[in-house]
Amino acid sequence: MSWLDKLLPPKIKQTDPKSRKGIPEGLWVKCPSCEAVLYRNDVDANLHVCPKCDHHMRIGARERLDALLDPEGRYEIGQEIVPVDSLKFKDSRKYPDRLKEAMDETGETDAMVVMGGAIHTLPVVAACFEFSFMGGSMGSVVGERFARGAQNALEQHVPFICFTASGGARMQESLLSLMQMAKTTAMLTKLSEAKLPFISVLTDPTMGGVSASFAFLGDVVIAEPKALIGFAGPRVIEQTVREKLPEGFQRAEFLLKTGAIDMIVDRRKMRDEIAQLLALLQRQPADALA
């Protein structure tokens, strides 16, 4: 027994590390904005919005779709499509190794989830990026799932909604990923010709090839509060132009002020706001919504 053990009262003893295995981890989360320490269950119940400062944290694709769509009648689109290493690409690591790691961490097979369903009984098709999967980068699978979602909306004659959260085109797929920019915008042209609404919701972050292709092509373009939206990141721009950027540059509020987006909507009100917009765009009475 050490001299310190002799001084400590009997009740103040270091617990056995083996006994700590039953203690659950991740019960608390720190807000990246106000740095408040929050109970994770409260954050989850608040759709990952800080109850102290209203900061919108990042949220998973399926959790977002769960909050958007009615619980009944959902169906997934394009889940059978999986990525392949057509170019045998290798940077610091092999592409298949990166894919496997992302799949294990997220439980998804790529960076987009597409579902058909309804919002307050109004039928829709909704696509959502999974940012945790390789930064939400757009590759062949993301482009194909987006296209199939839009095609399904055409066939069902229902509106199409997309929530973006992406760093841009997927480097590991080179030109195949860049081709998705044209592919996705071409599908939106078909939706426009069919007079079907497309609502684009820009979340943090929406950058690169996604922002440069379909993200701003919505009949209504919505953003979440303080979302980072642009092509190149602010640090890259500052290093290039060698000037300090204005406060809030490339944030949702800046884009609203300059007319690049139509509205900013709190995540907790998103479902109701989109339902109201769909009723308006389809000339349905708003008070008829369930």
UniProtKB/Swiss-Prot annotation:
Belongs to the AccD/PCCB family. Component of the acetyl coenzyme A carboxylase (ACC) complex. Biotin carboxylase (BC) catalyzes the carboxylation of biotin on its carrier protein (BCCP) and then the CO(2) group is transferred by the transcarboxylase to acetyl-CoA to form malonyl-CoA. A zinc finger (C4-type) spans 31-53. Keywords: ATP-binding, Cytoplasm, Fatty acid biosynthesis, Fatty acid metabolism, Lipid biosynthesis, Lipid metabolism, Metal-binding, Nucleotide-binding, Transferase, Zinc, Zinc-finger. It is found in: Cytoplasm. It comes from Burkholderia multivorans (strain ATCC 17616 / 249). Residues 27-290 form the CoA carboxyltransferase N-terminal domain. It catalyses: N(6)-carboxybiotinyl-L-lysyl-[protein] + acetyl-CoA = N(6)-biotinyl-L-lysyl-[protein] + malonyl-CoA. It is an enzyme of class 2 (transferase). GO terms for biological process: fatty acid biosynthetic process; malonyl-CoA biosynthetic process. Zn(2+) binds at C31, C34, C50, C53. The keyword Transferase applies. Acetyl-CoA carboxylase is a heterohexamer composed of biotin carboxyl carrier protein (AccB), biotin carboxylase (AccC) and two subunits each of ACCase subunit alpha (AccA) and ACCase subunit beta (AccD). This is Acetyl-coenzyme A carboxylase carboxyl transferase subunit beta. One of its GO terms (cellular component) is acetate CoA-transferase complex. GO terms for molecular function: acetyl-CoA carboxylase activity; ATP binding; carboxyl- or carbamoyltransferase activity; zinc ion binding.
